[in-house]
Regions:
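Conserved catalytic-core segment of NTP-binding enzymes
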Residues: 1, 9, 14-102
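Short acidic/histidine-rich motifs immediately flanking catalytic phosphotransfer sites
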Residues: 6
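C-terminal helix of von Willebrand factor
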Residues: 96-119
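Long, low-complexity, intrinsically disordered segments
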Residues: 118-127
């Protein structure tokens, strides 16, 4: 219904349940819902969560995480770990929200035909 109203982006936050008991597994396992996803962020508390979360998403659900955020990226050591262990960017949403938003915007522009072409860019408007 939202797509028919011209919504460009829907952000779906699933909480801490990729391995928990919150019903997130059913959402991630649904091929129709998964196909709608154009960018996947993993929020991780620590290096173990980074490594395990990226592997779980790929091996169990066939989802390639695009960027890691969360407390694991609170410092340079964590950001370097993310890059070294996963090959993914680690971008802290609290300390670098603009960089994270720009990264996601670039991913969507690459993956969604016409994304952003008819809308003003709020990030550029702030400059």
């Amino acid at each position: 219904a939202l797509a028919r109203q011209g919504v460009d982006i829907i952000v779906a936050e699933t909480g801490d349940g990729i391995m928990g008991e919150y019903g997130v597994q059913e959402i991630l396992a649904d091929p129709e819902l998964r196909a709608l996803g154009k960018a996947f962020l993993l929020c991780a508390n620590d290096p173990v969560g980074v490594s395990g979360g990226v592997q779980e998403m790929k091996n169990v659900y066939g989802i390639q995480v695009d960027v890691v955020t969360g407390p694991a990226t609170d410092n340079d050591v964590g950001v370097r770990f993310v890059a070294k262990a996963t090959g993914l960017p680690g971008i802290n949403a609290r300390t670098k929200p603009r960089i994270l938003a720009e990264h996601i915007q670039e991913l969507l522009e690459e993956r969604v035909p016409g994304f952003g072409s008819k809308r003003r860019n709020a990030l550029k408007d702030e400059e």
